[in-house]
């Protein structure tokens, strides 16, 4: 069967929101605008995102509106009740998440800590939000002496357990994380991911190893990715996409080290023949800059991404479609360190349609991205969202 686009490459710029969502007040996020606030005072331009039409979606510093953008453009609001990475990504692929994952800005409750201690026979230490390197520097030597579990979290709904590989063998750490995963499926906790964070080294020189393992929840329903896989299309997950969906609907998973490595891996995928989708998450915007409220670093990361777009575009086939979007906001000037409830930008670029691009109606949800992908490959559409193909005047 011939499809309008043989391949769709979906890129999520993690946390790159484009202004407060219609229900931002309910999340205490009035006035949030990740892109605008990140780019204010930035002295470099973003010529490639500009020519695609990013500045046509909303007024932005250093990104001007253009008369004829090369990409179709709009912005979408979130229907689900959370503003975390998993919720945003699951909605992009067609789900509406009505029960929010829980975050723990003050650490995990005593009841859960006691359950973990009773189950493992090991004491829990730390129990607060922290960066992984920081918490290991602080507690690593103690952990080596005692065998305690370093438990910590972040602004995301995650519970991370760090332990020295010479003190708690990997298999035991993995077993502990599997058991904690089962514990935290309880609705009163509902944590999105449990992460094993092994490290090695000596005090003052600890390093985390590549033996990290994520124990996610499976999506709360079938996604567009499941439909694609079941219909023998390729679903190539790049970066943390495989973890976000717990492997559901994925045919190939490719790990990445950072944003630029993610772009390298995507461009390599684009150079090889396949039929279906590639799906890349660029996490640095969120993890390295948004949560840390590093406005300058965030802006430079967007510039670095902008500079990679010509190489990506030059390697596209005529019947490829690239979708650039986000999953939530993370305004670097907002109070605290949490995500912000924002619209997400959507740019849809295809070499065969770049002279015909225009604004798309945006009165719909993140799921319209998944609906567009499903419509293109003629697989069952999600219950939520609306395909943009007809508005793009794409013949099926």
UniProtKB/Swiss-Prot annotation:
GO terms for molecular function: magnesium ion binding; manganese ion binding; phosphopentomutase activity. One of its GO terms (cellular component) is cytosol. It is found in: Cytoplasm. The keyword Isomerase applies. Mn(2+) 2 binds at residues 286, 291, 339. Its cofactor is Mn(2+). Transmembrane segments: none annotated. CDD domains: PPM. GO terms for biological process: 2-deoxyribose 1-phosphate catabolic process; 5-phosphoribose 1-diphosphate biosynthetic process; metabolic compound salvage; nucleotide metabolic process. Binds 2 manganese ions. It catalyses: 2-deoxy-alpha-D-ribose 1-phosphate = 2-deoxy-D-ribose 5-phosphate; alpha-D-ribose 1-phosphate = D-ribose 5-phosphate. Pathway: Carbohydrate degradation; 2-deoxy-D-ribose 1-phosphate degradation; D-glyceraldehyde 3-phosphate and acetaldehyde from 2-deoxy-alpha-D-ribose 1-phosphate: step 1/2. It is an enzyme of class 5 (isomerase). Its EC number is 5.4.2.7. Keywords: Cytoplasm, Isomerase, Manganese, Metal-binding. Mn(2+) 1 binds at residues 14, 327-328. SUPFAM superfamilies: Alkaline phosphatase-like (SSF53649), DeoB insert domain-like (SSF143856). The keyword Chloroplast does not apply. Belongs to the phosphopentomutase family. PANTHER family: PHOSPHOPENTOMUTASE. Isomerase that catalyzes the conversion of deoxy-ribose 1-phosphate (dRib-1-P) and ribose 1-phosphate (Rib-1-P) to deoxy-ribose 5-phosphate (dRib-5-P) and ribose 5-phosphate (Rib-5-P), respectively. This is Phosphopentomutase. It comes from Staphylococcus carnosus (strain TM300). The gene is deoB.
